[in-house]
Amino acid sequence: MPIMTWIKDETVAIITMTNGENRQNLEFAKTLSAMLDEIIADKSISALIITSNDEKNFSQGIDVLWIMDNMQKNNHQPVTDFINEMDNVFKKLLLYPVPVIAAINGHAFGNGSIMSCACDFRFMRSDRGFFCFPEVNIGIPFRWGMNAFVKKAIPLHILSQMQFTGNRYTAPELEKHNIIVKACANQEDLMASAIAFAKTLQKKRGILGEMKKRLYNDVIKVLDADFMPPSAKIDSLMMSD
């Protein structure tokens, strides 16, 4: 069974994550990266929406059990590959030549929230789900590249509160700070609002892509500098005290 699928609604592509909590591992990163390439090859696509079909979750972030299992086996390469491939996904989303919208239908934690920040716009349900950066509670600080682009989506004074407390935020709270475009009443409102908004964004790929390259030039440099070589030790990303 696929972990994500995509369909077209007129000129809007909709990626739907279909793997429950949609935990992110190497398979997730490779699948999403390939799907982004497949979608953008369709010249009729003018916008992209990313969402989930799970009743509770958008994405619960990194597949920690998968990472811990590989670390216990001293099998660092798949995890290193995942981190680099996920950074590649972030770069693709940042530079995607059509607008990218996250339709957050449920919990977005850790890398799930971070991925939504790589998108251009965010919509979220008011009746279900929290948005949270729990890294401070599990001993995994944001990587440099993540910090570089999350700041485009969240004002720094709010981001510092979110990172340092690990608190959970609702859609109305995010809307208040313009982190999301709209706090939607329910699932139907979420998708209707995101799709209607996406269909207003009939922009030429050339100019939009160039604007993104210039706007995020410094961010991409930081992401590139974050590349993990094969010799990197994954446990160096975690802090115990």
Residue positions per predicted region:
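Terminal peptide-recognition signature
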Residues: I15, T31-L32, I50, D63, ...
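C-terminal long alpha-helix characteristic of the crotonase
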Residues: M124-R125, E175-D226
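Well-ordered beta-strand positions
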Residues: F121, Q161, T165-N167, K182
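Hydrophobic, secondary-structure "cap" segments at the distal end of domains
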Residues: N147-H157
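Conserved CoA-thioester-binding segment of acyl-CoA-metabolizing enzymes
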Residues: M1-T51
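Glycine-rich beta-to-alpha active-site loop
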Residues: E85-N137
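Glycine- (often His-adjacent) and acidic-residue-rich active-site loop
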Residues: S52-N88
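Hydrophobic/aromatic residues within transmembrane alpha-helices
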Residues: I50, M115-S116, L174, A194
